Regions:
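N-terminal presequence-like segments and adjacent domain-start helices
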Residues: 1-12
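Short amphipathic alpha-helix segments
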Residues: 12-20
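Active-site phosphate/pyrophosphate- and oxyanion-stabilizing loops and adjacent acidic/basic residues
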Residues: 18, 57, 61
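Short edge beta-strands and adjacent turn/loop segments
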Residues: 22-39
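Solvent-exposed beta-strand sheet faces enriched in polar/charged residues
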Residues: 30-32, 41-43, 81-83
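Histidine-centered active-site/metal-ligand motif
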Residues: 37, 56, 75
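A short interface-forming secondary-structure element
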Residues: 41-56
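C-terminal structural segments of small proteins and small subunits
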Residues: 60-85
Length: 85
């Protein structure tokens, strides 16, 4: 169990993936990184008709609980790729 207010169990990568799949069930999610810095790639129909910025905002708003706070497990998303299938 993490010491972050979200109290997720498992790795940060698993927490990111499960959060995104809860919001976008059809999503194919790839997360890599560590030390608070992560690369995220998401393929989902949820991005259809959205601009790149809108798609990236959707992803970041979905994982904001892992980014915000005094000692967040995610300090930076170094790369974020969003695509439709």
């Amino acid at each position: 169990v993490s010491d972050h207010p979200t109290d997720f169990v498992g790795s940060v990568e698993e927490a990111i993936t499960s959060s995104l799949k809860a919001k976008m069930p059809d999503a194919v999610v790839e997360v890599s990184g560590g030390g608070g810095h992560y690369k995220i790639a998401v393929v989902s129909t949820a991005f259809a008709g959205k601009s790149m910025l809108e798609s990236q905002r959707l992803v970041l708003s979905t994982i904001k609980h892992l980014i915000n706070g005094a000692n967040p497990p995610v300090h930076a998303v170094d790369s974020l790729t969003t695509r439709t299938p």
